[in-house]
Amino acid sequence: MSRTTSSNTPTLPQAVQERGSLRTLEKGESQFIGSSSGIYFVNTVRRAFINANSRLSSRLLDTAHPTPEECIVADGEDEQQRPDVDASLLPSSFSYGHGIPTGLGRPPQPDVAKQLFMTYFQTWHRFFPFLHGPTILRDMEDLYSSLDENSRASEPIPPRVPTTLPKVVILQCIFNLASLHNSSQLPVASEIQKPTDLLSYLPGLAVKGDLVSIQALFAAGLLLVARMSLRAASVVSGLLSRAVFLAGLHRCPCRYGKLTADECDIRKRLFWCIYVFDRYLSQALGHPLGIQDSDVDVCPLDGPELHHPLLYPTVPSSYSGVASPFSGLSAMSVDATITGRQSEAGLGRATSEDESSQKHNRHSSLSFQVQYSRLLGRALELFHKSLHIRSIDSGSILSLQTDINALWNALPSSLQEFDPSSCDTTDRNQSQVFNESAHFILLHSQLVLLIHRPRLSLEPSTPEFQSAIQICINEAREIIKITSKQINAGYALFWPAYLSVTWMAGIVLAFACQLRLYSAEKGKREIGMCLDVLLHMSERWKLAKNCHAVLSDLAEAIQEMEHTAKRPAFEVSDSTFDSVHSGRDSVSSAMNYQSDSRKRARLDTESNPRSSQRNDGSGQPLNQIPADIVNVSMGEPLGSSFEPLDATDAAIEDDIQYFGDPGRLSSWESGMPDLLAGITWESLLGGINEDDPSWDSAFF
């Protein structure tokens, strides 16, 4: 690891330099996964287990075994889970009419459509309110009211009133998203079969600049994310970022007097949904941010509003007799918005705190997600920029940690505590599929993991690693506990980030157990819970099967490690150990080295009977046990295992167990008599020919 020093800016003692992964494929294709996805840390853990377990090494290096990249992004997952079916050949009573691609599917029966519509607004809309409910409801009613169900035509019934492509995309994405969490079976003819069925129609929408087209783009991206088609979703995210700038959504709409209050509200909601979407994909794939904070001046949904109309306060166009596409808002919400705008212009005051509070509560989930996404973006910019400009100083890290803690402390208590037993099961099943408190607890834990995870690729002997691993263990346990509770309570694990953060939590615990920095008994139990969660997630996402397979192998390796460590020392064969695992934090003063006379002092068994090291900067022990007593192997430091992995490298088995203090040597010798009783280092070394050039390397 390189070290970064500066005379002016305090820097980390160890440079944190996580890197991404680039794969080259056939026909000139290549795929990049950046370091923020966790790919570098996963490879670090993989190498640590391979070096410690030869049998696990053969499995992990098997080409049939999921690679780290295949546990982060499953290429073509959506196509593999859904058959290639032409919707035009499937039986269906309705169609969207001429000019609408059949690949988008056909409208379901009215009763199914109504149920799916309500499910969507009870679930996804709570977290991503990018649609204006009354408007999209009117579009759906217009569609079905124009379908002549009494028609005797052999072809599917088209609507009497033609509908547009953006509206069809929105409706179809709503139906497909809701079908993931609804008992109503969406007909195969109504499903969007593959991401390519969407992508080919979206570029034309990106250049239009109207809100409905941008909403259709976002709806398509949300469906792709829900199906774990992250690469395709990233393409849509790129279109969205350009569409945002073309339409001016990155500028606060309240600055412009020609926009109505209703339009300002929906433009804000749409922009912040796209912002959260961009931050998630940037972290999940390790890609650069699509929208920079420095380019945005949109005020938060929950205020304060910092901008004024340029001339006069905006009055909704419905008041002037002109139809507004957003006139379906309730009178209370419209009045509250108008009053707020008038107050900013100095022409009036808010009429009621209750109205303001109601608006705040309606968008509270999105508002808190935006705040977390801002911090997520800062973390990505700090730890995962290009290596040649990456600068990580302790002040920036401390500032980010402070803001993360401040945001967590600012959350309402209802979003900080997840207790499924306190919820009414009947009410929950009727109105809730997702749990908001669990969602924000997981968001917070994921963010804490993200800023501490880079230090887990440092040498384990460093204080930075020791501190980070304990913090990550705590967050990993919380993540596994929350996801398990959600499953047991019947909540849907809807957001794909739940998969990556749950798997990462299991990897952290496995890594800690492998290093003897966490109780193996507790670790095995919690990793087992994590495997159960991943198995549950695999019913929806193929990617979870890959994660489950890899974590299962690591859990098996931990089990083998514990089995070996519990055997009596006299049963351990010479081939089991090759050297003593170096103690990282042993007291260096246990043995003094006299360079002028090469005399060694007697080991002080009272003050430190097991640990004796020389503080020469290497951190390696001097008093290794002679090979004729026990033959054990020196496990290579993790720092040296960061080099590119060679499949031909020898796997080193490391089965020494720590108890509490990772710096102590294991207690393997506790079950056998003290063979060194009464023997001094002088007597042991007295028979060695110090003139022999192989003497020093043979023992030290």
Curated annotation (Swiss-Prot):
Record's compositionally biased regions (Basic and acidic residues): 596-607
SMART domains: Fungal_trans
Region annotation (Disordered) ranges: 343-364, 577-624
Record note on biotechnological use: Fusaproliferin shows cytotoxicity against pancreatic cancer cell lines and provides a new chemical scaffold that can be further developed to obtain more potent synthetic agents against pancreatic cancer. Fusaproliferin and its analogs show also anti-inflammatory activity and can be hit compounds for the treatment of inflammation-associated diseases.
Subcellular locations according to the entry: Nucleus
Biological process annotations from GO: DNA-templated transcription
Compositionally biased spans, kind Polar residues: 577-595, 608-623
Function: Probable transcrition factor; part of the gene cluster that mediates the biosynthesis of the mycotoxin fusaproliferin (FUP) that belongs to the class of bicyclic sesterterpenoids.
Protein name: Probable transcription factor FUP6
Organism: Fusarium proliferatum (strain ET1) (Orchid endophyte fungus)
Taxonomic lineage: Eukaryota, Fungi, Dikarya, Ascomycota, Pezizomycotina
